[in-house]
């Protein structure tokens, strides 16, 4: 496994693979890698095959944070990250500094104006512009044949697919299932900031969503399903719901009636730690 910190190094290493038309599979991450990331990397290794290459980027992207304290406290575990990458069969790790990725005079950004109008896009202004901009840069740098993203960030996955479609990036986007702890809590880099008590409390998100799916499939109105889920979450001390919505799983627009494809998505604070999760209804 080789590690690069500059764009020039990465491009030079990938040149021979592009000339041979090898499979190049990209897994973009912000580090603090956990079992969910490991599953993405292992899926990438299978997809690339023996002759292809897997590229993992590790970059805490400053322009997708709308809260400076969130950026400063975001977990960073560089040594462990490299161990996870090597164990999963990654060929190249790209870990640039912010000044390597962005010029101080940066004036171009990629915006998405429809799918990002709800959920995380509404509660975190500018977030998805930052995501789309860094991914556009990574797609240009790596020129992957394939890229893999987790479904925990369901809205992000939908936006990435739209960006690839609308801007004609020649890359296949793959969505990977959410990896969970035995109690149902979704793996997240932010889990490291939870207290032991909060980790137990955070299971309520999954419990509320499983109840919501049962109610929705039984024919309950979306508004009632959402009301019951919110009550379950708010019944846990110290929680604060950022958003809890039932949306069309393709357009990310809120739905009031019982129809499919539908998705329940939530962002919930436990203390000052914000966790997201979703479930297809």
UniProtKB/Swiss-Prot annotation:
Active site annotation, chain numbering: 37 (proton donor)
Keywords: ATP-binding, Cytoplasm, Ligase, Nucleotide-binding, Pantothenate biosynthesis
E.C. number: 6.3.2.1
Chemical reaction(s) catalysed: (R)-pantoate + beta-alanine + ATP = (R)-pantothenate + AMP + diphosphate + H(+)
Residues that coordinate or bind (R)-pantoate: 64, 156
Positions of ATP binding: 30-37, 150-153, 179, 187-190
Gene3D superfamilies tied to this protein: HUPs, Pantoate-beta-alanine ligase, C-terminal domain
GO MF, any single term: ATP binding
Gene Ontology biological process terms from the UniProt entry: pantothenate biosynthetic process
Entries under InterPro entries matching the protein: Cyt_trans-like, Pantoate_ligase, Pantoate_ligase_C, Rossmann-like_a/b/a_fold
Subcellular localization(s) per the UniProt record: Cytoplasm
Superkingdom to which the source organism belongs: Bacteria
Pathway(s) the chain acts in: Cofactor biosynthesis; (R)-pantothenate biosynthesis; (R)-pantothenate from (R)-pantoate and beta-alanine: step 1/1
Binding site for beta-alanine: 64
Keyword Amino-acid biosynthesis applies: no
SUPFAM superfamilies the UniProt entry points to: Nucleotidylyl transferase (SSF52374)
Function: Catalyzes the condensation of pantoate with beta-alanine in an ATP-dependent reaction via a pantoyl-adenylate intermediate.
Additional note from the record: The reaction proceeds by a bi uni uni bi ping pong mechanism.
Subunit structure: Homodimer.
Family membership: Belongs to the pantothenate synthetase family.
Protein name (record): Pantothenate synthetase
Species, as recorded: Akkermansia muciniphila (strain ATCC BAA-835 / DSM 22959 / JCM 33894 / BCRC 81048 / CCUG 64013 / CIP 107961 / Muc)
């Amino acid at each position: 496994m080789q590690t690069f910190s500059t764009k020039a190094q990465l491009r030079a290493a990938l040149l021979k693979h592009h000339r041979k038309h090898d499979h190049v599979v990209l897994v973009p991450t912000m580090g603090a890698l956990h079992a969910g990331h490991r599953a993405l990397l292992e899926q990438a290794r299978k997809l690339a095959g023996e002759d292809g290459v897997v590229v993992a980027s590790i970059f805490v992207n400053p322009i997708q944070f709308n809260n400076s304290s969130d950026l400063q406290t975001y977990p960073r575990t560089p040594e462990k990250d490299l161990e996870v990458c090597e164990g999963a069969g990654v060929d190249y790790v790209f870990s640039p500094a912010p000044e390597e990725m962005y010029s101080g005079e940066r004036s171009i950004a990629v915006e998405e104006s429809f799918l990002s109008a709800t959920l995380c896009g509404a509660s975190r202004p500018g977030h998805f512009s930052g995501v789309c901009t860094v991914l556009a840069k990574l797609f240009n740098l790596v020129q992957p044949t394939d890229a893999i993203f987790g479904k925990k960030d369901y809205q992000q996955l939908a936006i990435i697919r739209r960006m690839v479609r609308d801007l004609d990036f020649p890359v296949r986007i793959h969505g990977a299932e959410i990896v969970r702890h035995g109690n149902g809590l979704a793996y997240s880099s932010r889990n490291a900031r939870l207290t032991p008590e909060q980790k137990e409390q955070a299971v309520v998100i999954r419990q509320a969503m499983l109840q919501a799916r049962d109610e929705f499939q039984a024919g309950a109105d979306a508004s009632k399903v959402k009301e019951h889920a919110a009550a379950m979450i708010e019944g846990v001390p110290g929680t604060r719901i950022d958003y809890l919505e039932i949306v069309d799983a393709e357009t990310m627009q809120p739905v009031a009636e019982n129809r499919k494809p539908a998705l329940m998505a939530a962002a919930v604070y436990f203390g000052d730690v914000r966790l997201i999760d979703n479930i297809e209804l």
